[in-house]
């Protein structure tokens, strides 16, 4: 939902999503803006080529070795 939004609009979107969460709504969001995802999500599913490679809290998925390998690559020492 944040594609093409400026920083102010993204902040307003995050505030709106949080207001819905406080009211008890569950939100399914497909998004590539990781700042937005990490700031509003309680649980994240990470996909790579259509396959779920990790799920968990934001802290868990950013530390997951599969996520790091898929999105940041491996160092030369690991290959």
Segments from the language model and where they lie:
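Glycine-rich phosphate-binding loops of nucleotide-dependent enzymes
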Residues: 1-79
